[in-house]
Swiss-Prot record:
Keywords: Disulfide bond, Endoplasmic reticulum, Glycoprotein, GPI-anchor biosynthesis, Hydrolase, Membrane, Protease, Signal, Thiol protease, Transmembrane, Transmembrane helix
Further remark: Present with 1560 molecules/cell in log phase SD medium.
PTM statement from Swiss-Prot or TrEMBL: The disulfide bond between GPI8 and GPI16 is important for normal enzyme activity.
Protein name (database record): GPI-anchor transamidase
Keyword Cell membrane: no
Gene responsible for this protein: GPI8
Lineage: Eukaryota, Fungi, Dikarya, Ascomycota, Saccharomycotina
Gene Ontology molecular function: any one: GPI-anchor transamidase activity
GO biological process, one term: fungal-type cell wall organization
Positions in the Lumenal compartment: 23-376
Signal sequence, renumbered to the chain: 1-22
Record's function text: Mediates GPI anchoring in the endoplasmic reticulum, by replacing a protein's C-terminal GPI attachment signal peptide with a pre-assembled GPI. During this transamidation reaction, the GPI transamidase forms a carbonyl intermediate with the substrate protein.
Glycosylated residues, chain numbering: 256, 346
Active site (record annotation): 157, 199
Source organism of the structure: Saccharomyces cerevisiae (strain ATCC 204508 / S288c)
């Protein structure tokens, strides 16, 4: 008899149990990321005052990834660093990417890892492949692993299948391709997003052959990449067109943005860039329309790697932020109604406590920043409502039975 009396409570508890984040394994698998850390390698390969725009290009990207949460410990910045304190700089100690001088790119705790003559082809290849001596500082190493997404941005002067370094040497597209293959063999990345802004930029990714690499370049073979505008006070161009319009798009991005890399690619037009932007996707497992910009430009926090689902942590935050709040309210109202029903029928305080315990462990009160992520569905809501109906019907039946029993003993 006691079991029958508490049967509805047991049913209600069983139906609500899947709403607990700790037990909703299906939902958790859908949002666990394949990458646990994001890195950025930002390289300006030129030097001298008249290449001011290249330093502004790379510092602009540096500012963007820092704004979106990637820490300096996961950013490798390589640049000549000969502009801010150049004697021709009318604004000593400052670098601007726009003639309105709205943002000082050099004034926000810039940490340069490789400067001046340290920016060499050898150091760049060693950085990617991690071929250093034991005494090389960790702060100047790319300490990635098989769960790392890496954004690599390069700017400077280039040609057909080559990019000049410091106007003294060149790196070929085959060199970068082979370095990426070594990274793949050594399990140094999960995915790579390669972006290059230079003349004939698209030729620099033509030799890539390693998996999980997405590449974009500012110009086709035999095309130049152009500067956007000059500053009459500084006396030179302050940013390139491709990077300018990249930044124009990225300024609307925050850490929770749902915009994708395809959205970024679609924003490039010949009228804006004055050259044909190229995108290479054949080595990449995902469609760019499924790759959030924050998968590469923002930081990753509180994730567990899982090879079974190729979803990034950005998808995780995206889904969490867009869970239907009305669904939460419905579940909450159902539990409140069930509790009120128990109270009206003079049930014990233990039963009331049990319902409160269910609420405290359900989706309604979960910490939105926890590692557990789950989704409530209409099917689950229907199950809760069904359990409530069964409970109410049982109380109605029990009430009639109790009255009949009372009449039997009193008459």
């Amino acid at each position: 008899m006691r079991i029958a009396m508490h049967l509805p409570l047991l049913l209600l508890y069983i139906f609500l149990l899947p709403l607990s984040g700790a037990n909703n394994t299906d939902a958790a698998h859908e949002v666990i990321a394949t990458n646990t850390n994001n890195w950025a390698v930002l390289v300006s390969t030129s030097r001298f005052w008249f290449n001011y725009r290249h330093m502004a290009n790379v510092l602009s990207m540096y500012r963007t990834v820092k704004r979106l949460g990637i820490p300096d410990s996961q950013i490798i910045l390589m640049l000549s660093d000969d502009v801010a304190c150049n004697s021709r700089n009318l604004f000593p100690g400052s670098v601007f990417n726009n003639k309105d001088h709205a943002i000082d790119l050099y004034g926000d705790s810039v940490e340069v890892d490789y400067r001046g003559y340290e920016v060499t082809v050898e150091n760049f290849i060693r950085l990617l492949t991690d071929r250093w001596t034991e005494d090389h500082p960790k702060s100047k190493r790319l300490l990635t692993d098989e769960n790392s997404n890496i954004f690599i941005y390069m700017t400077g002067h280039g040609g057909d299948d080559f990019l000049k370094f410091q106007d003294a040497e060149e790196i070929a597209s085959e060199d970068i391709a082979d370095a990426f293959q070594q990274m793949y063999e050594k399990k140094r990345y999960n995915e790579i997003f390669f972006m290059i802004d230079t003349c004939q930029a698209n030729t620099m990714y033509s030799k890539f052959y390693s998996p999980n690499i997405l590449a974009v370049g500012s110009s086709e073979m035999d095309e130049s990449s152009y500067s956007h505008h000059s500053d009459v006070e500084i006396g030179v161009a302050v940013i390139d067109r491709f990077t300018y319009y990249c930044l124009d798009f990225l300024e609307q991005i925050d850490k929770n943005s749902t915009l994708t890399l395809q959205d970024l690619f679609d924003s490039f037009t010949f009228e804006k860039i004055h050259s044909h932007v190229g995108v290479r996707t054949d080595l990449f497992d995902r469609n760019p329309s499924e790759v959030l910009i924050t998968d590469f430009f923002a930081n990753v926090q509180n994730v567990i790697p899982d090879d079974s689902k190729p979803l990034s942590v950005s998808h995780y935050h995206h889904y969490k932020d867009h869970i239907d709040t009305a669904q939460y309210e419905l579940n909450n109202n159902v539990l409140d109604l069930a509790l009120e029903t128990y109270r009206k029928n003079n049930q014990s305080s233990k039963i009331e406590k049990k319902i409160k315990d269910i609420k405290s462990t359900s989706v309604l009160d979960v910490d939105i920043d926890s590692n557990e992520c789950f989704f409530t569905s209409f099917k689950q809501s229907a199950t809760i409502i069904l359990a409530l109906i069964v409970t109410i019907l049982w109380f109605m039946l029990r009430g009639n039975t109790a009255k009949a029993t009372y009449d039997l003993y009193t008459n």
